[in-house]
Amino acid sequence: INPEDPSSGLLPNVSGMEAGAYGSADKRIQAYCFRMCLSNHPENKVPFTKPENYDAYQYELLGRVFESGWRELFHKFDHIPNRKTDTNNHGPFSTDFIGGNYEYPEASYQKRAEIIQNHKDYQQGLLYFIATDPRVPIDLQTKFNEWGLAADEFTDNGNWPHQLYIREARRMIGEYVMTEKDVLTERQVPESVGMGSYTMDSHNAQRYVKPGGFVQNEGDIGVKIPVPYQISYRSLIPKAEECTNLLVPVCVSSSHIAFGSIRMEPVFMILGQSAATAAVLAMEQDVDIQQLAYHELQERLDADQQVLIYEKKESGY
């Protein structure tokens, strides 16, 4: 709380736990946020208003981040047509509500609704803090107030996105677990049903205090991959002794690191197509999905022009 006295307590949303040991497991998952559609058109923007339970102290750490000289506030205002943005998290203190989602994967629908509301309160409070608090540098604040929620988007929900960005939650432990070695093509993936190509990208999972008294974000990863990689059919199906006739194209059998790349929407569409094809073949043959012959699935996917293997071309890929 007092930057001159490490024993004075912790600021809001700073964990009192230590960083995890290498190789150890825990319940922490990468942070969630709402991806917002903003506009700087004077006739199509809604100013950022004060949330009902707003508490400026929740953003004390951000005030200190600004005081340190940080200025990357607009780095994820990705522009889309009609003077709008797809605005996402960026930087040490941003729209990601770090630590606010640990209970989400196994929570009831009622508890999940509470967690989603907490994220909304946090993020709307953040916007109001940046727009109004005197600790925000005036040049950044002036530029920030050129923006607002797009008035013609999400008109039935106060111009706020309906869906929280659930980057990761539960993951299955199936017949094959995709890992970093697979994504980096360091081992042969069996029975490919599609490919991924995005960076191994995961957001922070916690914010804690280092021994010297400084706050540290932990969990952010951004590792490029050399070439597109294969995704195994066996990572879409559970172990036969645990469950049959279930295909899982989203919460796939994967390590956290590998899922950082697999979790992209185009990959989900690719795996969804392959899972649907496997389901049809299993029904036609009256067999469990674990009993489906891969060569038959491969033939059908090839006929449907699903890309199952990376073939390098002279002009790149």
Write out the residue ranges for each language-model feature.
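Flavin (FAD/FMN)-binding glycine-rich loop and adjacent Rossmann-like elements that form
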Residues: I1-Y317
